[in-house]
Amino acid sequence: MSDKFQLLLQQIGMPLDARQSGAFSTATIEKVVLHKVSKLWEFTFRFETPLPLMDYQLFKARLATEFEKVGNKIQFSIVSDAEAFEAGLVEAYYPEAFTEDLCQSAGFKALFQPLEVAYRDGVLWIKGPETIDTDHFRKNHLPNLVEQYKRFGFGNLAVDIQVCQEMTQQQAEIFHAQNAEIYQQANEENLAALEQLAQMAPPPEAAQPFVPEYKKNRPAKVNIEKAEITPMIEVDSEENRIVFEGLVFEVEQKTTKTGRVIINFKMTDYTSSFTLQKWAKNEEEAQKFDMVKKGNWLRVRGNVETNNFTRDLTMNVQEVQEVKKEIRKDLMPEGEKRVEFHAHTNMSTMDALPAVEDLVARAAAWGHKAVAITDHGNVQSFPHGYHAARKAGIKPLFGMEANIVEDSVPIAYNEADVVLSDATYVVFDVETTGLSAVNNALIQIAASKMHKGNIIAEFDEFIDPGHPLSQFTTDLTGITDEHVRGSKPLEQVLREFQDFCQDSVMVAHNATFDVGFMNVNYERAGLPIISQPVIDTLEFARNLYPDFKRHGLGPLTKRFGVALEHHHMANYDAEATGRLLFIFLKDALEKHNLTNLNQLNTELIAEDSYKKARVKHATLYVINQVGLKNMFKLVSLSNTKYFEGVPRIPRTVLNAHREGLILGTACQEGEVFDDLLSKGIDEAVKTAAYYDFIEVMPPALYAPMIAKEQFKDMAEIEETIKQLIEVGRRAGLPVLATGNVHYIDPEEEIYREIIVRALGQGAPINWTIGNGENAQPAPLPKAHFRTTSEMLDEFAFLGESLAREIVITNPNAMLDRFEDVQVVKTDLYTPYIEKAEETVAELTYQKAFEIYGNPLPDIIDLRIEKELTSILGNGFAVIYLASQMLVHRSNERGYLVGSRGSVGSSFVATMIGITEVNPMPPHYVCPNCQHSEFITDGSYGSGFDLPDKDCEKCGTKYKKDGQDIPFETFLGFDGDKVPDIDLNFSGDDQPSAHLDVRDIFGEENAFRAGTVGTVAAKTAYGFVRGYERDYGKFYRDVEVERLAAGAAGVKRTTGQHPGGIIVFPDYMDVYDFTPVQYPADDVTASWQTTHFNFHDIDENVLKLDILGHDDPTMVRKLQDLSGIDPQTIPADDKGVMALFSGTEILGVTPEQIGTPTGMLGIPEFGTNFVRGMVEETKPTTFSELLQLSGLSHGTDVWLGNAQDLIKAGIANLSTVIGCRDDIMVYLMHAGLPPKMAFNIMERVRKGLWLKISEEERNGYIQAMKDNKVPDWYIESCGKIKYMFPKAHAAAYVMMALRVAYFKVHHPLYYYCAYFSIRAKAFDLATMSGGLERVKAKMEEIALKKKNNEASNVEQDLYTTLELVNEMLERGFKFGKLDLYKSHATDFLIEEDTLIPPFVAMDGLGENVAKQVVAARAEGEFLSKTELRKRGGLSGTLVEKMDEMGILGKMPEDNQLSLFDDLF
């Protein structure tokens, strides 16, 4: 695009000498994007090298000037081919960076622009003082500076900061000058001086600059109570003495090292939002501002200034006052309030906002007796709505806005015995001023009379509607006022057309519309409606060609080569439809032997024609328990068997499950409303007979239909509402005024706007007006939750009496039909396994006797008795037995199963084989004579740490076990908590384990645990930015945050838990608990899921967590390679423990592998974070490893807590709080009662320590102090937010140590298994290129990581290369991919070398890899062509193999294969 670039240079007026210079003469336009709404042009230019700074500045200025002249904005970036840069050029660009938007943060600019820079060794170094927060710079500003240099054309430039000692004092003074109070004082002094100067100065002669109204006449001192409140949207620059009033939606309070308190908060007045800051001298002064809380309305006074470290304006607050701002209230008297029968929650996919809890709470706050939940096609809000309504004390009305379809849509109407080949057809089309036959007018009727494929007569008449045509109508149809002016009267045209159609079969594309329009107009004219047969070519095509994606007239004419010059002009459409008709008739005869019109409906309509039927909305409501189950069945069927684009309910299916349900007519998408507009009131009355009540909505909810010209004005909408009420009267049905609620308060409308627009054009609820580039989004209705008074005001045009009847009387009367319904059950319903209780007890004692002897030691006997009493007494035996059966089956297939969560706290689970973790106190047990010795004084944290010892009775070496975990941490102190047994199966075996559940319990009783995916915060942020871009909006950052928060949480999709399976008892039905569906509406999925989020029912049914995990797969691979049984590997191997304190055991130095310990690639301990913890703590025992595991998985357990205690020497790794169970055990050893120790553990592990009452907390603290628990321990408890269970840590550490054992003692097996199973990214050329090449690649990626430029693939590759480097340093080799040796998916060992598999090659998938191996087995590849054909490899992959030296001297072709091709 160099020619286009030169043309651009001419257009922007670049001087000729510049255009012909070396830099500009070879440049090109690489990419250009135009954002039409915001008129923003984004260019990417390619230059050989970055431009000289003066050339860049000239180019930038000319672009901006010329584009602004025509009302456009421009952004551009430069891509350069250069890899090395001149130091002077790089440094010269540094000040220029601060003129660009990316580096405009005032604080960043003020502090960093004056600093000196130096470019050396590929890095631009910024010389800064010690007082600069380098971490803050690298996190918040460095990425922007790097990106700006990239846009200048310095693509691979790195930037960093270098501390410069001599600048410290100067920079410190600048920092102190930024104290908020000094700023405020300086602003006041400056303002006073300016005012004094203004009084002394003569009146100005020149015109004064524009001053916004809100800034005029502002007094020097502002009384916050009397001050004029400034709308936030009007403040776009720095300004003093501003007063805002708004809602606080975020608060953060920080205490500085000097004790000062900074209160940062964000407010909105719904015109925009602002960030505010208040400084307090100390905590005591900060308490004066405790009204600054989320959800409070405040009036604030202060100065608006540019924040030093953000790019937004911030108010430095001087005064705060709380404002009483009450939510809207329903002020109608008790007994005279409405009930909302049509409300959506955030479970209406990408359409509505309120959480059901908020909807219910608002209805209750208003004093409404009930509120309905009617989400689109689902009932996922039912469980939360049920609980919320019970809590609020109002009646929940459980409903759904369903998509109703006819089981089959006729191809032919008014059927008759007509031979298709002999018939005469009138193929007609009408053009209208809108979609409503009642409210819009006919403006053209055209038809072609055809016989045996030939046109024998034509009809074409325009009709004057009596008013000018709208631009919308003209744009759509091409018909202008000139076409219709002076045309025949409508009645005359209708009579002539009826005569034209005599003795013919009528044909139209989408005939229901055309016939409906004609019949309404015939009736008005007093003429008979159409009675002759009618064929609908739309339905004809859908059934004849079901594989076509589109069946509109345009796509069909293109597919069959039929001319259609002016689509949407009736005469052209009619002729094209006629041509298609005879193609269809010919195919119907040849493919289906259809000869008679009567056969079209009986023999051609497909069983699944409901998939193409037009969807009509209806509201379904549950009135009793039978209805709830029927609702669940309908939701299930519509989301599985009848799903097509949306959940569909065929009418016959609805009829079969209608007991216990009542039906409302829904919104304008309902069939009664549609029939009223398209067929008239008589047809609407007939249709209404199917329903139980008529819905009418406020005129404002129908108002968007005016924009689509379905209504002329609000008066026409009001008339239609009156007709709907008349339909109800004539049908004998009550009429209810409903609000079609999509958000609660009017100001939330913008959130829905953002969500709906994010769907893009073409989404049903985001329909547009106009076509192509002229298409504009149609307005959305005002769909907030209305009070009774607001609703009465909406219907005031009906008169007070009728308005009260439909708004108040009828909805309240309808309530009497609703019984109380239980959506969520209160009990646990486990599946039935015969003799489960006896089997669990038998297996437990059998294993216990085998290990500990008979009779059992008292400590074992008492523990088993305690656990079995709880397990059997509460009906949990079947859960234990089911888990045991699943683990046993996987073990039989050769895989270990790791446990997760707290199941390892149960000794019964250990004995029956569910978990390897033994929760008894540390102990010895003799494998020969079963003698045992238990250590119960807390002196050891794990039995694996006990010193080796021989049995005192028989001399056999003792086994050591026991992790000292109380049973209470699994099933609660009273043992009645439903067990949640999570299991880690091998990822390879997980599918088989899932199928085992079906085999054990039956396919009809096992479903994947369903989840609901909602719009995440980051996604919502993207939606807001997209809305801002596409619709020409400009928001400050804090307003984007507010809008994103409002748009987040809306349902976007559904899914499934990665390993969760819900089992329903066979003595009940799944529909007693939940509907079912497919995950993400994927009807090809092999498993159905629960419709409800599994958390909503996990207290009522059995949930099995059958997760896939790499550890069991890795251990199985190591076992296969070595023949070593992993269960025989000791947990206290000295060589393995040496990994945690150094690298010597690996035979390498820390410098060789880049880390001081041997943790690379060890599960649980191999991440950068945990490696750092290992380096700090240097664990030497199993119990310390448990501590590390707990510390690394908890929240606020290590950072700012245990880490500080260890550094200060107050505690050590063994004594800090690591795992949740340790708290209970430690406190019991200290002397606290078990119940209190348990309660303290529960409060701490859930982060509730500071949330419980002061009285309760002080009671616990006193008890701990009385038992000499140290103060640091008590303080540590208060900081914790979440804790890891010790049983989980023990299971993970045991697996990790098995893997580590092979790394130490069988390294090549370890590396083979690691690269086969755990490694995520490969670079075979680097990996097989030797140590230097590996280290160079690691350095390259490390630099990118430092500059936040490394991609996810590069970061994964770095992890792989760390292990490759370690393996090479240990003396092993990495071979090349070998065409005749490499496995498809696994690494292979050949002496001291690893041979990579085919899948390790970039772009080569598993299926192709297996095909290559299979083809290889059939014979040698004689040429590259043969390799491509037989191996299924692409030309690109073969080329890569050749470049890597894998193919040797393989020729492109071989003569034999060429000869074969010729014959």
Curated annotation (Swiss-Prot):
Disulphide bonds in the chain: none
Keyword Transcription regulation: no
Catalytic reaction annotation: DNA(n) + a 2'-deoxyribonucleoside 5'-triphosphate = DNA(n+1) + diphosphate
InterPro entries: DNA_pol3_alpha_NTPase_dom, DNA_pol3_finger, DNA_PolC-like_N_II, DNA_PolC-type_N_I, DnaE2/DnaE/PolC, DNAPol_HHH, DnaQ, Exonuclease_RNaseT/DNA_pol3
GO cellular component, one term: cytoplasm
Subcellular location: Cytoplasm
Transmembrane portions of the chain: none
Record EC number: 2.7.7.7
SMART domains, alphabetized: EXOIII (SM00479), POLIIIAc (SM00481)
Keywords of the record: Cytoplasm, DNA replication, DNA-directed DNA polymerase, Exonuclease, Hydrolase, Nuclease, Nucleotidyltransferase, Transferase
GO MF terms held by the record: 3'-5' exonuclease activity; DNA binding; DNA-directed DNA polymerase activity
GO biological process assignments: DNA-templated DNA replication
Domain Exonuclease, chain residue ranges per copy: 425-581
Enzyme class: transferase
Pfam family, one: DNA_pol3_a_NI
HAMAP family: DNApol_PolC
Homology family: Belongs to the DNA polymerase type-C family. PolC subfamily.
Described function: Required for replicative DNA synthesis. This DNA polymerase also exhibits 3' to 5' exonuclease activity.
Protein name: DNA polymerase III PolC-type
Organism: Streptococcus suis (strain 05ZYH33)
